[in-house]
């Protein structure tokens, strides 16, 4: 699956199935192992997790923060394409400096998409 197809599939999933708003494909890209990585950015309809403790998220009147999404194909994931160095380069070159996490969108051959949080650095486990 081509990079543009992967990005379009994730964008449509976020907009029409997950009900995100303000989803856009960022123009900057990162060349990694012969592939081009591009991020999406968008606003989820609700808080995605309870581990980000910021004041503006507790306010009902303020919008949810924008999230960054990195779409990759399952075959790239299996081939050790996604390494710590790749993620570090993604945070450094494609995200804003204040970004603490990105959503990794892994697309299977059947079109299924799963989302995982990837944090910048080591994080203390959250309490339930």
Curated annotation (Swiss-Prot):
- Topological category with respect to the lipid bilayer: Peripheral membrane protein
Report if keyword tRNA processing is assigned. Answer: yes
Q: Which UniProt keywords apply?
A: Membrane, Mitochondrion, Mitochondrion outer membrane, Nucleus, tRNA processing
Q: Name one GO molecular function term.
A: nucleic acid binding
Entry GO CC:
endomembrane system; mitochondrial outer membrane; tRNA-intron endonuclease complex
**Which Pfam family is one of this chain's hits?**
Sen15
Keyword Protein transport appears in the UniProt entry = no
Q: Which GO terms describe its biological process?
A: tRNA-type intron splice site recognition and cleavage
User: Which InterPro entries does the entry link to?
Assistant: Sen15_fungi (IPR042777), tRNA-endonuc_su_Sen15 (IPR018593), tRNA_endonuc-like_dom_sf (IPR011856), tRNA_intron_Endo_cat-like_sf (IPR036167)
Q: Where is this chain's protein located in or outside the cell? A: Nucleus; Endomembrane system; Mitochondrion outer membrane
Please give the function described in this protein's UniProt entry. Non-catalytic subunit of the tRNA-splicing endonuclease complex, a complex responsible for identification and cleavage of the splice sites in pre-tRNA. It cleaves pre-tRNA at the 5' and 3' splice sites to release the intron. The products are an intron and two tRNA half-molecules bearing 2',3' cyclic phosphate and 5'-OH termini. There are no conserved sequences at the splice sites, but the intron is invariably located at the same site in the gene, placing the splice sites an invariant distance from the constant structural features of the tRNA body.
Q: How does it assemble?
A: tRNA splicing endonuclease is a heterotetramer composed of SEN2, SEN15, SEN34 and SEN54. Interacts directly with SEN34.
Miscellaneous notes: The tRNA splicing endonuclease complex is present with 100 molecules/cell.
Family membership, please give it.
Belongs to the SEN15 family.
UniProt-recorded name of the protein: tRNA-splicing endonuclease subunit SEN15
Q: Which organism is it from?
A: Saccharomyces cerevisiae (strain ATCC 204508 / S288c) (Baker's yeast)
